[in-house]
Each structure stands twice: as C-alpha cells, then as structure tokens.
C-alpha cells in the first residue's frame, strides 16, 4: 500500500467502516484490514532490510528446536582429512568423526502503530499507508540492528583486523580490499579443494564509496577513472572490485551507529589513526550465517483504542541470528 496510489473502492469502504462509531462494526473492519496488510508487511520486513542478503532465513516448524549441526571438520583440521596410498592389500584406515551442534535462541520482536479514528472515518487512506510504512520500518530497523550486532560480535571474536599501512588515515584504497581478500583466504580454513574461504562482499560507509570516485592516477588508469566518473551509484565500477561486491550502509562510518557499537560496546578497535570500519564476509560458503524464523510477522487490530477514539495495529514475530563459523567474517579499517 503506497501513499500516492489510491486503493480500490472496496478498501475505501472498508476503511470508512473501520472508523464507525459502532464498535462492533469498527472492530470487524479493522480485523479485515489487519489481515489484508499482514502479507505486504511480512514481505517488506523480510526483504526490505540489509541483513537478509547475508543471513539465510530458515523458517521452522512449530515446536522445532533451532539446532544447527556444525561442520564435521573442526576449524584448522581440514588438511588432516586426506586419502591414503593403498599398496593393494591390507585394511583401509578408519577415521571416526562426530559432529556437534549449536542452538540459536529465538526471541520475540514486537511493534505497534495507531492514529486518530477520524482519519479512517473520513477515508484518509494516505494516513493508513504512512502508518503501515512506519510499522514496517520499526521491524526492519530492529532486524537490521540485531543482525549486524551479531555480525560485529563475530568479527570482534575472530580478533583479526586488516589495514593498509601505506595509506593515509581515512583513505579507502584498493590495496585494503586486496589485503582483506588475501587474509580471508589464508585464514578461512581449508585448501584449494576443501572449504576455501573467499571474501565475496564488503560492507563500508558511503564515504568509502565516494573515495573511489576520487582515486588518482596512482590508484586507477585513465580508462577506469572515466568509467568511475560516468557510473551511477549502483554502477559496477563503484560496487565491484576484484570480484568483491561493495555495499555502502549508513550505519557504518566515523561516529555512526554500528561502528560505535563495534568500538564502545564490543571493545573492538581500529588501527591507530584509522577512522572507519569495513566488514568483509564470505557469502560463497553458505554454512555460517543463519536466521531461524519461528514465527512470521503477524498483524492484529487493537480493540482497546476505540474508547480513546483511535485506531491501531500491532504485530509480532519470533526470529534469531547466529554465526556458526566466524572465519566467514573479517574486519578492516582505513
């Protein structure tokens, strides 16, 4: 439901009835509106945020425990699982392995919104549309924060920080990307065949993306610079370097929310004189970032508001976040 597109006449009539002075009529109409808005809101919450591109959503059956098996190969032992030369007779060596599991706790996420009953009675549908946008935005913000707090905690726990020692403070360089790619491969476990780590995506601030536009001839040749100058914000020259996808998010940057959480709440640190954080993730191996969903978003009408001449809706969901292998995430600074 958008603020600029007029809904159908049936919905307008339903909206008018939801503002009726007859409480029974109003509540019945509000219940229909809540169910009509539930599916669009659910889609917006699941696909309108910046973490579902990283975490794999896993809907669970009612009563199912959010347990996830860990890899049979313990971190750092991949090279020990090798085959043997058989001389032609004799017993083949046995190797016994037993996998462990981790349980990712889920929790409830709730939000609500309400507005004056007269807006519904007068069929002021743009107010309802804006109210639903605010309700959706509250869920999205909460999911973003919880998901990124989990990612940043895993990055701090890994205790590896990559930086370009030759770059000026606050300068985002392609060498930093190259160094992070190398560190991710060398410290990601495995070998050329078994579970190799590779940094596929890098999350940075909008200022870092703008730094690319200001790279000089020591960073880019003239042809590449021209492509950068002419590209849009989503253009490949700005968003893909060395096969690594670049994503700019507002919450990362000097003095921004996620960077402050990384430093002040988690005790992480940047290299001396560096001012911004970047986060690299390996999304080629989909074995680490999980998002169990026990309950999809549900929306209900708030019957108690009719006495105050207001109309409102509330909703809840039950989700969780987990990083099963922190070798799939890497922090850097510039």
Task: State the predicted function of each range.
Residues 4-5, 12, 215-334:
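Sequence/fold signature of self-assembling virion shell proteins
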Residues 106-118:
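Residues forming anionic-ligand binding surfaces in small-molecule and nucleic-acid pockets
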Residues 111, 195-200, 309-311:
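Structural beta-strand/beta-sheet cores of well-ordered domains, especially the beta-sheet scaffolds
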Residues 115-192, 333:
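Alpha-helical scaffold segments that mediate packing/assembly in large oligomeric complexes
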Residues 117, 206-208, 317:
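Short, flexible loop/turn elements at secondary-structure junctions
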Residues 156-234:
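Extended, solvent-exposed, turn-rich assembly/linker loops in the middle of proteins
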């Amino acid at each position: 439901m958008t603020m600029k597109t007029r809904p159908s006449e049936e919905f307008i009539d339903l909206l008018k009835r939801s503002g009726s002075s007859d409480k029974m009529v109003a509540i019945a109409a509000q219940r229909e509106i809540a169910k009509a808005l539930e599916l669009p809101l659910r889609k917006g919450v699941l696909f309108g945020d910046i973490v579902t591109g990283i975490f794999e959503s896993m809907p669970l059956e009612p009563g199912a425990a959010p347990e996830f098996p860990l890899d049979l190969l313990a971190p750092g032992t991949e090279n020990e699982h090798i085959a043997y030369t058989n001389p032609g007779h004799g017993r083949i060596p046995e190797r016994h392995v037993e996998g462990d599991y981790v349980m990712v706790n889920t929790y409830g996420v709730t939000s609500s919104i309400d507005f004056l009953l007269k807006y519904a009675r007068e069929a002021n549908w743009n107010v309802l549309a804006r109210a639903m946008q605010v309700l959706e935005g509250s869920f999205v913000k909460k999911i973003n924060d919880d998901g990124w707090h989990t990612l940043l905690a895993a990055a701090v726990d890994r205790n590896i920080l990559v930086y370009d020692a030759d770059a000026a403070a606050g300068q985002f360089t392609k060498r930093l990307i190259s160094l992070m790619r190398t560190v991710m491969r060398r410290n990601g476990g495995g070998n050329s065949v078994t579970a190799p780590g590779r940094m596929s995506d890098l999350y940075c601030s909008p200022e870092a993306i703008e730094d690319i536009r200001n790279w000089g001839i020591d960073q880019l040749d003239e042809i590449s610079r021209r492509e950068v100058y002419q590209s849009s914000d989503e253009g490949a020259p700005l968003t893909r370097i060395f096969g690594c996808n670049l994503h700019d998010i507002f919450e990362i940057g000097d003095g921004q929310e996620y960077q402050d959480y990384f430093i002040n709440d988690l005790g992480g640190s940047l290299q001396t004189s560096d001012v911004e954080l970047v986060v690299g993730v390996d999304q080629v191996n989909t074995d680490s970032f999980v998002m169990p969903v026990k309950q999809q978003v549900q929306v209900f009408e708030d019957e108690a508001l009719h006495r105050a001449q207001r109309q409102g809706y509330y909703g809840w969901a039950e989700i969780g976040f987990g990083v099963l292998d922190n070798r799939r995430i890497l922090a850097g600074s510039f």
